Structure formats: structure tokens, C-alpha cells
């Protein structure tokens, strides 16, 4: 149940902000498994563990809903941590999902059902949880993240011991760092908090806009500072953005800066699915009110968290469901913004976002082959739904769902048609 709640806390597109905030507090301190169970799992997964480890601490240093972590020392003398999956966690999660679905049928959840299709949400949650419960995927995530940030000297992730990874066991280097929100210890250790905050924000935006592969749960417990580097931990939940997503995000940012409601609405619908008809005039008016309230002439003063939660509510009210990865990014940005408020409140993530877009635009214009790419784009013409006018885009989506009827009236229909 805890893992389900944690995953749901990332879905601002599905649940009201107050629900997500409450669920985000579910940082599980679950009763750990007995070490005998842990030992047996390690033997089943890795074989003769006495040939691998000098010692394994019987006391876990972290116990969560799907796994627990123990310190250990390899035969080589290297200090590591072992992440061990809880016994029968797949079966437990499957049972929990079934119980939730049964509760939906038995209870009168009228308000919530109007907001979201709970059965579909639960299926989606289970798919996400299954990925998190496969530690081979997390090991792949760590390696991909490392490669993406290989040339950035201030970003790193724990080393993975690839020969000691299975679906149920993950062995990584032990990272002894300072929590990213422990201001006093960071200051005592000689860190510049403004510089640290700027590095964190720049890298997170890079993860999204350049790599298209970002940490989807970057709360402070999943980061620490070691030897001048920001260490990202627990990469079980990651988000992905394709080139279309990244371009639409840039378009959205430009629309916000220019206060272009029509373009912003167009982008939001382009990265969404609709579950009913849309009143475009009302939608634009409500988005305009949110912009007027949160975005002044000085965009540095924007309240990111309030702005994103308000937009999410408007979209839910208008039967619009944002792409899952976009909502993961929105949630991640809000979490990073909360961390910045604690350690370097003068840094504004929106300005970092805008500067990154300008940098990318400049690089795109002057990059090798950009003229050829531009020519190809002109020749190819309008080749995606994202380029259609907003009302036409919504109309096409309605037709695809079978929710639109087209009446055709033929003039002079009483006359016989010649073949």
C-alpha cells in the first residue's frame, strides 16, 4: 500500500494537489526482514556469498516498502551496499492492487471517480511498480545516467557491480555523503550553497531537455553531496521525454514568457489525451487567470509549485490528462524547487529553464547540418498532430475516440445522382 501511495504522489495530473502532498509523506520505515531471510535471498540470487563478501552487516541501514539495504565489504575490500528485494513482494503488490479495485466497486467514490478512472490508474501504478521491483532495470538506469553525465564533473551516481545484479539483488558502492538539505554541515564543509543550488537546477533541466532521461523522484533523501559532487541515489523511478516532448516543453516555456495563452493551450493539449469535450474559450480564460496570478512582468517571481498545481487542476477539470512523463517532470521540478528554497532560495528554476532553452536554440541554429535539417523540415511540411491548430487537434482526438458525429447535408438531394 505504501509503494502505491508513493507512486500516486507523483501524479498531479490525476489527483488534486492536497492528495499528492499527503501521499508524498509516505516515506516508509517498514519493519525489516529477518537477516536469515536476507541471507537466504542472497544465496539464492548470487550463489556462494562467502566467496563474494568479507562480511555483511546484519543490521539494515534502510528499510522501505519493496526492499531493504545492508552495508557489506567485498573480498576486494571495497565498501558496498546490498539492496535486497522483500520476499514475495510481487504477490503482495498484486494482492494490494486487487483489494483497491474491489474497494472501488464496493465504496461510493463518486468524487474521485469523476476525477480519474481509478482502475486504469491502478493498472498503470502496477506497471510502474513492477519496473521498480526489477533491480536489473535500476542498474541499467544507473549506467545510462552515468553515461549521460560523464563529462559533468559535479554529478555522479554510485558504481554498480554488474556481476552482482539480479532482479532481486543490487550491489553498489557505499556512498557516505552529506544530505543536500543539511545546510550547516554543508557550510562547515566549505560548500557554497548558491553554487550548489545552481549546479543542481542546471543539471536537472539538462536531464529533461538534453538527455530526455531524468530522475522522477529527486527528493532530498535521494541525493547527497560527496567530494564536491551531487550524488543521485535510488534510480528505480525515471522519466523519459522524446524529442517531440522536449520541443513542446520549450514551446510551453516560450508561451509562458510571452503570455501567449493560445500557444500554451495548444501545447498542453498536444502533450495530453482528452477524455471528453473541451470548452476552449473557458479553458483559455482559466489558464489566463493562473498566468495573471502567478506570472508578473518579472518571471523570476513566479511561484512554480502553485502555478503547476493550478494548471494541473484546470486540465483535470477540462477532461485533459497530461502525458505521464510530463507529470513526472512537473512533480520532479516541484521537488527540486522545494530543495532550492531550503538551500539557495535566490535561484529560480524557471529562469534556469528559460536560459537552457536559449542556449539550446543558439546551439541548434549554429550546429553543423542545421541548414540541411531546416530544409528537410520545410519539405516535409506539417507532419505531426502537434502542429495542428488547437481546436482541430481536439477534434481529431474526439474522432479517434468515436465521440464526434459528422452530419453531411447534400444539396439538391432529391435529384438522382448520375453514375
What are these regions, as identified by a protein language model?
Residues 1-207, 212, 220, 224-419:
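Broad phosphate/nucleotide-binding scaffolds in NTP-utilizing and phosphate-metabolizing enzymes
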Residues 215:
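Histidine-centered phosphotransfer motif of kinases
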